[in-house]
Amino acid sequence: KIITPPIR
């Protein structure tokens, strides 16, 4: 599972 930071 790849975790990505929230992009606005």
UniProtKB/Swiss-Prot annotation:
- Give the source's domain of life in one word: Eukaryota
Q: Which UniProt keywords apply?
A: Secreted
Where is this gene product found? Secreted
Mind telling me which GO cellular component terms the entry cites? extracellular region
Tissue-by-tissue expression: Expressed by the venom gland.
Q: What is its main location?
A: secreted
Function noted in UniProt: Does not induce hemolytic activity, lactate dehydrogenase (LDH) release from mast cells, mast cell degranulation, and antimicrobial effects. In vivo, injection into mice induces increase in nociceptive sensibility, but causes very reduced or no edema formation. It also reduces locomotion, suggesting an increase in anxiety, but causes no alteration in rearing (standing on hind limbs).
**Protein name listed in UniProt:** Cryptide Pep-8
**Which organism's genome codes for this protein?**
Tityus obscurus
Which taxonomic lineage is given here? Eukaryota, Metazoa, Ecdysozoa, Arthropoda, Chelicerata
